[in-house]
Amino acid sequence: MTSESRETRTSVALLKRLRPDYIEVEYLPGCVFNTAAMNEVQQARRELMGITPYSMLSIVPEDVDYELSAMNVDHLAVDRKEGALLAIAVVTHANMMELVMKLYFSYYPQLSRIKVTASEDEGRKWLTAQMEELSRTG
């Protein structure tokens, strides 16, 4: 796999593979998180990242909504089982969505390296530190 930047768009997000071990998922303003949309993002992530384990920064804008049924699905179960996700930072720009994401990740424990924050700078710094530690410890 080469290290050039690649990107793709789904109905709800722009996904950018910036390195073979790092992807950013920027959800589109006004989108709705539902099971079909999350499956679409998951498929796009797999196509961009292949089988290489990676870290992910997800950015959720202020005006995103969600369907309750999407909360009843562990959307990252397969990736976690396969060891694909090393660390996740989720940046939410709305208090309600931050609470929803924290609730979701407590209901479906993902992995030990996960952070939900309202600060993009904090999310990026945290994820960078996690990636540096992973590169040292494996």
Report the location of each language-model feature.
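Amphipathic, Lys/Arg-enriched alpha-helical "gate/interface" segment within cytosolic domains
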Residues: 1-138
